[in-house]
Amino acid sequence: MWHAENCDLCGDCLVRCQYVDYDRVKAVQQIKQLMAGKPAEILELCITCVACNEYCPTAANPFDLINRLQEVHKSLPIPEKSRKFMDAGGTMPSALIKGDDSKPALSMCVMEPFISNDAVGGRMFEDMTVVKGGEYFCYLGYVHIGMDSPLIENARGFIDKLAGIEAKEIVFFHPDCYAMISKMPDYGIEVPFKAIHIIEYMRNYLKAHSDEVVPLNRKIAYQRPCASRYSGEIETILDEMFDLIGVERVARKYDRESAQCCGSLFSRIYPDRIKPMMEANVEDASKAGAEAMVFLCPLCMGALARPAGEKGMKPVLLSQLARMALGELPFPA
């Protein structure tokens, strides 16, 4: 939620934006226009990476204002195909597969069609109750097509459906779902279960079963997804997980707070702007000495797997990497 009372017009959010070249005067001018509800230039140039929320030193959440006004002013030239893709999320076939009630449940959102069969399995996910499909769709992806209202309209149904599992704890495989949960206080909705980020769940499992872990001794580049901007506290947990499995997260330009969006959607909308940045992101990972490019979001992997492979880096989902450390999967040759 946008907190106008927190904004001191410092301009940091847009000065640090990697997708525009604003000095502080221009940045402040843009924020003032946004605060007045005007169709500021940034509404069209923003690629919805959410980074400005993380950059803001006063927790004003400028992206939330930008995103709301993108919808009001219809600022983004979203292809009809992309809108239909998003709308299809809520209509996908759903399933609830009962498991051991003493374990947390696992929500897959609508990600199952976008991952390989070995991404979820083995001892770490054994006997968990699993829910998946449109009935458990989180709707957060709509922010990437410049829309905020679908989140608000579907928030209650999202929580109610998950509550119907009657699980005390739910692990969210898709980072967007965990991000959506973080928005519930803004919507005045109580969450009647403990939400667990997939990274926290895997870290906890690996820590509890450290005697089963075989250090991988690999260097990887991590592609931080846009949804992680809503849950910055997970970064230290991820670093701990990498330490547990003997993986070095290479230091590079486009990581952590300076991570770039994968470009999956906006490379189609603004190819001249975004494709060179995607190439720079992958090149950055390669030059840092990464043997693999590791993804949390399956859609990020879909966008960057091929260019990463062309640079000699194996594309790997984070859950696959954890299973490799448990000896359940081989590190790709």
Language-model segments: residues:
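Iron-sulfur (Fe-S) cluster-binding segments and ferredoxin-like electron-carrier domains
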Residues: 15-32, 55-72, 267-285, 303-313
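Catalytic cores of enzyme domains
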Residues: 196-201, 211-212, 217-232, 245-248, ...
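Conserved beta-strand elements of the Class I
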Residues: 105, 221, 292-294
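Cofactor-cradling patches in redox/metallo enzymes
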Residues: 119-121, 128-193, 229-230, 236, ...
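A broadly conserved sequence feature marking short terminus-proximal activation segments
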Residues: 1-27, 254
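Iron-sulfur-cluster electron-transfer modules
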Residues: 4, 21-178, 184
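Short cysteine clusters
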Residues: 7-13, 17, 46-52, 56, ...
